[in-house]
Each structure stands twice: as structure tokens, then as C-alpha cells.
């Protein structure tokens, strides 16, 4: 392995054997495998939820922990993982994360009880937190030219979206044929291929002497964990129960201490200087609302089809396929239209489209024709397929390639917090309503409003500043 100067402040290592002419498709495949595994482990668990409930005799609260426990450690550790990537190198942290995720997936498959599965899912989330921001950083440095990078972001998102779209169907088939354990064993060959390709073909980025804000990260973790406990356990224990009120108090205290610390130290958890730019703030706000809506609705639909409509896991996966397959198709379309329209314009238009489609389902009942549900959710996912790469491109444009590690960590953290809150909120709705139809209707209302708020945020913080910049440049 030899080290070469790649320009600016970074260096890169030439892959083993001195090869530097690695095809773009090979690089994208290597860097997408981590995201594929992380995405699969949300979508396939949603379809397997009812089977896991029956097999391990879990409550709805425990099932929510199985899904959200993964997202909790994922969101909690993303910022710390971004700092580690800066300190010891993105490639090293990416491979570490893949290894942890690989072993945790095996532990999930072997889990004999709900408690053991929850613990393994927590470790899985930690592994995902390590490789997610490093994946974006490695992609940015692998494709330094902006136009090519934008195309590669679209292709990268399409690969991930395809796995997300096929995840419910593949997961349902595997659960029906081999049991719920098989959805975690699926990660083993994917992880092995991804680690081998990354080690062989992806060049390393330069490490930087960075102080890790460990006390701040610990407060961040405590605050998120306490909020998660209150949201997930509240419906079962009661919102005024001692443990729930204590969790809220711990969350508020940890958040207050974190805020005080952030204003007094030179190495804060959040890169607050980046939030001075409206594009960076807008991309992160859109990321939170987008994941709240997308993963909250996916969690709800996986259970709704099985409990309210009597579908098997495989049938539920097939029923979700026409709705989710639009997501990767739209990702590919984004790669073609991104040169004609600004990211802010695309985000605004397609967030509003997704919101309108979701709100059209607030009258859903068990007798609503399947094709009506499929069309509405499918249209929403057309919007989602544009939104995902669009927000990432807007973020990179706002932060600059030199801040890719930390910017990717912030965006992914906000997105996963959105997933965490969205899944927990849908769990609260389904636990608190009198029947599945009522729960689904309220869920679609929340999802639609989240998309619409995201659209307004994209217009105000991304699209309008882009137009002002374009006018200024023209004059």
C-alpha cells in the first residue's frame, strides 16, 4: 500500500497492488453495501414483526424496542463515529462498523428471547453508526468532481433504495420459508462481500488530529435513550408512571447540560458553524421529517397488512412491493433531472407530492381496495425517491467536501432520530387507538403533515437561497 497526495489537505492510499483505475461501479457497490444492510434491517424487520411477536411471545412494546433499539444506538453514536472517522480514517471506521454489524447480525439470528434480540439489535445499531457516515465521506473523496459526484449519489441512493424496495418482499419470503432468523443471516454474505471489496478497492482518506467530545457524546446518548424509553414504554406503563416521568426528567437534564457544554467548549458535539448556512440547516430538517414519515409509515403498514387484513409475512411483503419499488426508480430519475433543476426545487416539489399522497389515505379502512392504498403510498414513495439523494446532495453542497465526515454524521443522526421518533410515535398511535383502521388513519395524517412541513422547510431554507445565489451570480 502506497500513499499519494490527492490535492488539498487530504492524502489517499492506493489500493493493494497499486491499482488506481477502479471502475466507478465497483466503488459504488463497495460503499453501498453498508447502507444496504442498514436499510434492510429496518424494512425486513417490519414484515417479520408479527412472526417475531408470535415466535418469541413479545408484546407490541417489546417489538417496538426490537425495531427502535437498533435506531436508538444508530442515532446516538453517529456523531461520535464521525469524529472517529476524522481521527483514524474513514476507511478504517467503515470496516470496523461492518465487522460489528456482521457479528451482531449473527447474534440476532441466534437470539432465544426478546430481551436477547433487543440487546443484539442495540449492538447492530452501533455497527451501523460506525459505517454510515464513513460511507458518505469515502464516496465524496472517491468522486471529487461535483457533477460526477451528484450522479454517483443518485446511483448510490438507487442501490440502497432498491434493497429497501425489495426488502419487504425478500424478507416476507424468507420469513415464510426459513423463519424470522433468516432475515438477519441475510446480512452475512452481504457484509462479507462489502468488507472484502472495500478493503481491496477503496482508497483511505487522511486521518486528522481531532479531539473527541466524549462527555458531550455521553450526554447526547443519555438524552436520546431517555426520550426513547419514555415514548416506547409510555403507552404500556402509563404516561404519568414513575419510570416514564423519570425518563423525561433525565432527558431534559441531559439536554440542558449538553446545551451548556456546547457553548463553553472548543470541541462541541455539533458543528454549529455549519448550521449558519440555511442549506445545511434545511437539509437536516428535511432529513428528520423525511425519515419520521418514511420509516414510521413502513413500520405501521407492515403490521397493518398482517393484523387488519390478515396477510401472511410473504403476502404483506408482496403487497408492499408495488408501493416501495417506485423508490429506486425515482432515485434513478433523480440522477437524470438533477442537472436541470436545483436540489431545493426538487425537494420542495416532491415533499409536497408525498404529503398530498399520504393525506389522501386518512380515510383508510380494512375495506379500502388494495389498489387505492398501493397507488397512494406508491406516489408518496416516488417523492421519497427524489428526496433522499436530493437532501444528501444539498447537504454536501452546503457543507463542502472537506466537511463530508462531520456533515454526513449530522445528517444521518438527524435522519435516524426522525426514524426513532417516527417508529415510536406510530407505536404509540397503534397502542392507544381502538382499532387498526383508526390507528392507520391517524398515522397517515401524521406522515402527511411531516412531509408537508418538510416541503415548506426545503422551499424556505434551500430553494430560496439557491435562487438568490443564482441571481447574484448572474449579475
From Swiss-Prot:
Protein name per its UniProtKB record: Methylenomycin A resistance protein
Membership in a protein family: Belongs to the major facilitator superfamily.
Domain of life of the organism encoding this protein: Bacteria
Transmembrane regions listed in the UniProt entry: 28-48, 65-85, 93-113, 123-143, 152-172, 173-193, 212-232, 240-260, 285-305, 314-334, 346-366, 371-391, 416-436, 439-459
Protein keywords: Antibiotic resistance, Cell membrane, Membrane, Plasmid, Transmembrane, Transmembrane helix, Transport
Function summary: Resistance to the epoxide antibiotic methylenomycin A; probably by mediating its efflux.
GO cellular component, one term: plasma membrane
Annotated source species: Streptomyces coelicolor (strain ATCC BAA-471 / A3(2) / M145)
Amino acid at each position: 500500500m502506497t500513499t499519494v497526495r490527492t490535492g488539498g489537505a487530504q492524502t489517499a492510499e492506493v489500493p493493494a497492488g497499486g491499482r488506481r483505475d477502479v471502475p466507478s461501479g465497483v466503488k459504488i457497490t463497495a460503499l453501498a453495501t453498508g447502507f444496504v444492510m442498514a436499510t434492510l434491517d429496518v424494512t425486513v424487520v417490519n414484515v417479520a414483526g408479527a412472526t417475531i411477536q408470535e415466535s418469541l411471545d413479545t408484546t407490541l412494546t417489546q417489538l417496538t424496542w426490537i425495531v427502535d433499539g437498533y435506531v436508538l444506538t444508530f442515532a446516538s453514536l453517529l456523531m461520535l463515529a464521525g469524529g472517529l472517522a476524522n481521527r483514524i480514517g474513514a476507511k478504517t471506521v467503515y470496516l470496523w462498523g461492518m465487522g460489528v454489524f456482521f457479528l451482531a447480525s449473527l447474534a440476532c439470528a441466534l437470539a432465544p428471547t426478546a430481551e436477547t434480540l433487543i440487546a443484539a439489535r442495540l449492538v447492530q445499531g452501533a455497527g451501523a453508526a460506525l459505517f454510515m457516515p464513513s460511507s458518505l465521506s469515502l464516496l465524496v473523496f472517491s468522486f471529487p468532481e461535483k457533477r460526477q459526484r451528484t450522479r454517483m449519489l443518485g446511483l448510490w441512493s438507487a442501490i440502497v433504495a432498491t434493497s429497501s424496495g425489495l426488502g419487504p418482499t425478500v424478507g416476507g419470503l424468507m420469513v415464510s420459508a426459513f423463519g424470522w432468523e433468516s432475515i438477519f443471516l441475510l446480512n452475512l454474505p452481504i457484509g462479507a462481500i462489502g468488507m472484502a471489496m472495500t478493503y481491496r478497492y477503496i482508497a483511505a482518506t487522511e486521518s486528522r488530529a481531532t479531539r473527541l467530545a466524549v462527555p458531550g457524546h455521553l450526554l447526547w446518548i443519555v438524552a436520546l435513550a431517555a426520550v426513547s424509553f419514555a415514548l416506547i414504554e409510555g403507552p404500556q406503563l402509563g404516561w404519568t408512571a414513575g419510570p416514564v416521568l423519570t425518563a423525561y426528567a433525565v432527558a431534559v437534564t441531559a439536554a440542558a447540560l449538553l446545551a451548556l457544554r456546547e457553548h463553553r467548549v472548543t470541541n462541541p458535539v455539533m458543528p454549529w458553524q455549519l448550521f449558519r448556512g440555511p442549506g445545511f440547516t434545511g437539509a437536516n430538517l428535511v432529513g428528520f421529517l423525511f425519515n419520521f414519515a418514511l420509516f414510521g409509515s413502513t413500520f405501521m403498514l407492515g403490521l397493518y397488512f398482517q393484523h387488519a387484513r390478515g396477510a401472511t409475512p410473504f403476502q404483506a411483503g408482496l403487497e408492499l412491493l408495488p408501493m416501495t419499488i417506485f423508490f429506486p426508480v425515482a432515485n434513478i430519475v433523480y440522477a437524470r433531472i438533477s442537472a436541470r433543476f436545483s436540489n431545493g426545487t426538487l425537494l420542495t416539489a416532491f415533499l409536497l407530492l408525498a404529503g398530498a399522497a399520504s393525506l389522501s389515505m386518512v380515510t383508510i379502512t380494512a375495506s379500502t381496495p388494495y389498489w387505492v392504498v398501493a397507488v397512494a403510498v406508491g406516489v408518496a414513495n416516488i417523492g421519497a425517491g427524489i428526496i433522499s439523494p436530493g437532501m444528501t446532495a444539498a447537504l454536501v453542497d452546503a457543507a463542502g467536501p472537506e466537511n463530508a465526515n462531520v456533515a454526513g454524521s449530522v445528517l444521518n443522526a438527524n435522519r435516524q432520530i426522525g426514524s426513532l421518533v417516527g417508529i415510536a410515535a406510530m407505536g404509540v398511535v397503534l397502542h392507544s387507538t381502538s382499532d387498526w383502521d383508526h390507528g392507520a388513519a391517524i398515522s397517515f395524517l401524521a406522515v402527511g403533515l411531516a412531509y408537508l412541513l418538510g416541503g415548506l422547510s426545503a422551499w424556505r431554507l434551500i430553494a430560496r437561497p439557491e435562487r438568490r445565489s443564482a441571481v447574484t451570480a448572474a449579475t
